[in-house]
Amino acid sequence: MAHIYRLLLLLLSNLWFSAAAQNQSETEWPLHDNGLSKVVQWDHYSFQVNGQRIFIFSGEFHYWRIPVPELWRDILEKVKATGFTAFAFYSSWAYHAPNNRTVDFSTGARDITPIFELAKELGMYMIVRPGPYVNAEASAGGFPLWLTTGEYGSLRNDDPRYTAAWTPYFANMSQITSKYQVTDGHNTLVYQIENEYGQQWIGDPKDRNPNKTAVAYMELLEASALENGITVPLTSNDPNMNSKSWGSDWSNAGGNVDVAGLDSYPSCWTCDVSQCTSTNGEYVPYKVIDYYDYFQEVQPTLPSFMPEFQGGSYNPWAGPEGGCPQDTGAEFANLFYRWNIGQRVTAMSLYMLYGGTNWGAIAAPVTATSYDYSAPISEDRSIGAKYSETKLLALFTRTAKDLTMTEAIGNGTQYTTNTAVRAFELRNPQTNAGFYVTFHNDTTVGGNQAFKLHVNTSVGALTVPKNEGVIQLNGHQSKIIVTDFTLGKRTLLYSTAEVLTYAVFENRPTLVLWVPTGESGEFAIKGTKSGKVENGDGCSGINFKREKDYLVVNFSQAKGLSVLRLDNGVRVVLLDKAAAYRFWAPALTDDPIVQETETVLVHGPYLVRSASVSKSTLALRGDSVEKTTLEIFAPHSVRKITWNGKEVKTSQTPYGSLKATLAAPPTIKLPALTSWRSNDSLPERLPSYDDSGPAWIEANHMTTSNPSPPATLPVLYADEYGFHNGVRLWRGYFNGSASGVFLNIQGGSAFGWSAWLNGHFLDSHLGTATTSQANKTLTFSSSILNPTENVLLIVHDDTGHDQTTGALNPRGIIEARLLSNDTSSPAPGFTQWRIAGTAGGESNLDPIRGVFNEDGLFAERMGWHLPGFDDSAWTPENSTTSASSALSFTGATVRFFRTVVPLDIPAGLDVSISFVLSTPSAAPKGYRAQLFVNGYQYGRYNPHIGNQVVFPVPPGILDYQGDNTIGLAVWAQTEEGAGIQVDWKVNYVADSSLSVAGFGKGLRPGWTEERLKFA
């Protein structure tokens, strides 16, 4: 009876859904453009380019977090290989503007034109996001730090001072982008204005009471973009569902963009999920969010667009080593990205797709050096299960042209034979193609549920699979079941196995389907009467059953790749998940909208970067990390295969594919890290030290523009004096006696400081993961006081400027107050303060590496971290012949360790290397260390607070065919001193078209005598 009842419900619901579909198909949604061009248009369904609809599946990368331009190709080729149609990037105002007189888009890795050119070459659209504010877990949210003094107002408004500051950068960024727009045959699709600036309304957005300041600010940015040549649509991204800002469907109050979008991080943007409760509520793993109703309410005539959807999460200070990939891994990618499709989203960009590294002082205080983000492409540039899982869906969305125009017909458990499973039905009103997106009814439950699905098709209502087997949801999983799916000139009536992709060769489709290993599947193709098994690798229980208008094929797929041939010429490739992970569909065109005739199919390698056909030769570029069997499905005209420029011996299979074998790459062994030398890097603690040179500035400001004034004068905020990064040194002078000093210092989460009087160590604030300001009362022993002049040295490390409204939070000494020896006499005052920071301050002494790279340690000011510095007079450290070195000293001070190590990595390989820093078990942990590689600061190691120990350093920063200068600045914050173990390791070796040997020429300038004046 229960079964009959479900069938009756299905019949009734089918009648209602058919009527609903008819009504929806009759809806005339307006087709929008920006009034400047009709190249890019959009409507209720999706974006269109030159009249073709496109599913925008995009991912974010930050060029400024991987400052080796040759490696941008690596990242973007990996993005393209997933099947993505676009990529997005923030530009960084701070990265291009070392001071308020300079905008640099030409020096070293600041020239971003290769990114635009790669987009055209590789065939991907771009979502360009210039800010000027970008957030991004970057210091001050990407604002240049000279902006944070208060001199330019409170920021992110229409204040003329702030407007004058951002205009040169924003104009430059717009002018560069204007040369590479879709409207002129290039690939910039849209241009985002500001970032997560949900400030259009005062109070409840439903009241539509405009925030005139915010409106004016947005209009200034929009006008600047247009004045400087932007002709593609302008977009925005709401930070959450509450702000409802800048969309014309909601209101015409002013400041609106062409297409408004919504950002969402349903599993929290940080490994510390408690930080997301105010936005998402209590964290429940795999709990999904309803976006459909939001888009229907807020922007019904616009595409459902998510400029940022969760691609991972950043790891805060004190977070787990390696981040929290288990929170947003392959299962997350499988479920949440399909959930978005079920919500009718047709444009989404993953934040991040590749995170990179917070080298130098790029990071905001919320995170340490790694910006791996648990993204599909890891910080060390490797790809794994999450990348592959994302690829399974991205290739499908590139192939499923009918998915770009659908209406939501219904959803619920009535679609299935198991009430623990529900489905969302999407249907194309023009072609009647259907997409049933299935989930556990409670997505937080990850059990194994079996079911059959009630579907509407062109031959009527069916319950599938019709024959043997069931559909399974095993774990946190979703599946998209298609009906009346366009297959060239054929029709896939339905498939309970997911479609990966398809291609058409000689007018005959090759359809690729996949199921999790060991599961069964069933599909039906119209106009077919019979079929046969041509290769049964892992496939079993294959049954062909002819129906009136179609052929039903039922199968079970274990590990491997199987091939079926149908009598109407359709070839079907069946894969289990492991095989699907190694299956690729490289495009033969540079058009992001890839047609089914413009691709080949490849199985086996770790990565296929590109493919091209010339006469009878198919040229493949890619990576292999082990001995691999290469199998290719291509046009019959292809007879030869080249892999990375070399012809490989091929054989043809009985079912028409070509096979070849790729050899394993060689093993790479790194030389030992030995022959270390060291030197004292804190002479400033000594009373005899002379601070009258160019490195030092008198800190004598008696007023400040900062909205948070200090408790004592002079103003001891580092940014006031042009020193913005990391470690700054303060020398305070006073005469006569004092019993101590009260210090209150602010530096961001995980910051720290230490103090010395007349060369004698006093105390330190070691820091905690959550403390951004700390005060101490330090007592002076009479034995270390001088009767006349005394010098107090404070070494202060900050971890960047806060984001959003916290960008103006000062960095430095909030209060410095000497204490009297007795209550009857007043406390002495400081007679002078001097400050040292980055050599040259804002003058950008090293324009290649830039102002974020260095801070104020003596070693850095003197250039000890740079290639070519002569350390022959330094103290040799005990060396070993092992691959690692243990470096140690006693006493509270700063010491710099240095060695030079040659590398000779062969051409034709992509090799990834990481440094590993650790503290020996018996050594103290009260220290901070910075890792330098050929002059670049590529690691902040703080064992007292943080857990990051692995620091990837890319080729180009490392010289793979030459000498490498490795430096460590170690700041012991206690008298126990410090001990640090230094190792390095190979992450992977790939035979690759990306031959990284020789990368980075010109990016590693050496030491010059100019450094000596900053002693």
Curated annotation (Swiss-Prot):
It holds the Pfam family BetaGal_ABD2. Keywords: Carbohydrate metabolism, Disulfide bond, Glycoprotein, Glycosidase, Hydrolase, Polysaccharide degradation, Secreted, Signal. SMART domains: BetaGal_dom2 (SM01029). It is an enzyme of class 3 (hydrolase). Residues 1-21 form the signal peptide. It catalyses: Hydrolysis of terminal non-reducing beta-D-galactose residues in beta-D-galactosides. GO terms for cellular component: extracellular region. Substrate binds at residues 90, 135-137, 195, 265, 373. GO terms for biological process: polysaccharide catabolic process. SUPFAM superfamilies: (Trans)glycosidases, Beta-galactosidase LacA, domain 3, Galactose-binding domain-like, Glycosyl hydrolase domain. It comes from the Eukaryota. InterPro entries: Betagal_dom2, Betagal_dom2_sf, BetaGal_dom3, BetaGal_dom3_sf, BetaGal_jelly_roll_dom, Galactose-bd-like_sf, Gly_Hdrlase_35_cat, Glycoside_Hdrlase_35. Its main location: secreted. Its EC number is 3.2.1.23. It is found in: Secreted. The active site is at residues 196, 308. The keyword Disulfide bond applies. Belongs to the glycosyl hydrolase 35 family. Cleaves beta-linked terminal galactosyl residues from gangliosides, glycoproteins, and glycosaminoglycans. This is Probable beta-galactosidase B. The lineage of its organism: Eukaryota, Fungi, Dikarya, Ascomycota, Pezizomycotina. The gene is lacB.
